[in-house]
Structure formats: C-alpha cells, structure tokens
Amino acid sequence: EAARMASWLASRGVGSGDRVAIYARNHPESFILLFAASRIGAMMVPLNWRLSEEELAWQLADAAPSMLLYGADFAGIAGKLASHAGCPGFEIGTKLDAARESHGMEAEEGPGGPDAELMVVYTSGTTGRPKGAVLAQAAMRANAEMSHHAYAMTPDDHVLNILPLF
C-alpha cells in the first residue's frame, strides 16, 4: 500500500521536500502516508482534528502542504481548508484507494532516505502559536529502535496505540 501511495503522490506532483497534510481520526491511512512519504522524500503533516477551523487554517498556512488528505467525517471543513491552503484535497476511502490502485513503486526507487525530513508535528502552542517541529527519518528510526530494545519487541508482538496520531 505504501508503494502505491508513494507512486500516486509522485504522479500528483508531490516530491522531495513537499508536505502532505492529513486531517483524520486514527486511520491506517496515516501509517500508509508516513511510509509513502519516506519513500519519496516528502513530509507528512498530521493535523489535530480537535482544533477549530481557524486554528487548522493557520497551521495549514504555516505548513504550506502540497496536498490535504482527510477523513470522511471532516469532509465539510476539509474542502474549505484545502481551498484556503491552495492545495487539492482528497477524501480517504474508496475513491482514493481506486485512484492509487494502478500505481506501484519499487522499494529502491524514490529520493527518500535516512537524512530526509519526514514529519512536521505541531506543538501545543502554550506560549503562543503552535510551532511546526520537523522530525527526520533518522530520528524517528532511532526512536523506533529504542522502543524495540526497551520493550524487547519481536516480530510476533502487536502494539495497541490509543493515542491520537497527530
């Protein structure tokens, strides 16, 4: 799925250094986008679905995404946000699945790499406007490796994440 998403994003003009925002509750698409972005050198920008339209519009203006993916339950506001941000918006679901169905990318293709920036996560903004904290692939990999060792995880383990993915 990540390979098809990476190829589909590239076919829509998303490339190295571009940002793709995702506005959805916890959804497998968030992980698919994260791994797809890592392949093409793009950055994922997860949005806090608890924020007001005004706060989201500010974050999108700050992040300057090339594209907005959104969950069906946010379709009403997402169209306005995408228009305000000047980027296309695509609803997560069967239409997006069908659009990328014909795409594929070999694992070794794409400009993504360990030194590439991978995600922009916004702080809570307790002292002012939220700030976009940029996370590199290497930092996220190091975090995953530390978790793997700290919890003695094996390929047979499953992880339940109850936290929001923004």
Which residues does each predicted region cover?
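Conserved AMP-binding/adenylate-forming core of the ANL superfamily
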Residues: 1-27, 31-35, 52-57, 137-138
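Conserved structural elements of the adenylate-forming
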Residues: 1-4, 133-154, 159-166
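Structural core segment of the AMP-binding/adenylate-forming
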Residues: 4-12, 39-101, 108-111
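Short, well-ordered beta-strand segments
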Residues: 19-23, 118, 158-161
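Conserved G/P- and acidic residue-centered "switch" motifs that form tight phosphate/ATP-binding loops
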Residues: 20, 41, 126
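Conserved short alpha-helical elements in the N-terminal third of ANL/AMP-binding
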Residues: 36-40, 158
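Conserved pre-ATP/AMP-binding loop-to-beta segment of ANL
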Residues: 105-122, 129, 152-158
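Conserved AMP-binding A3 loop
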Residues: 118-142
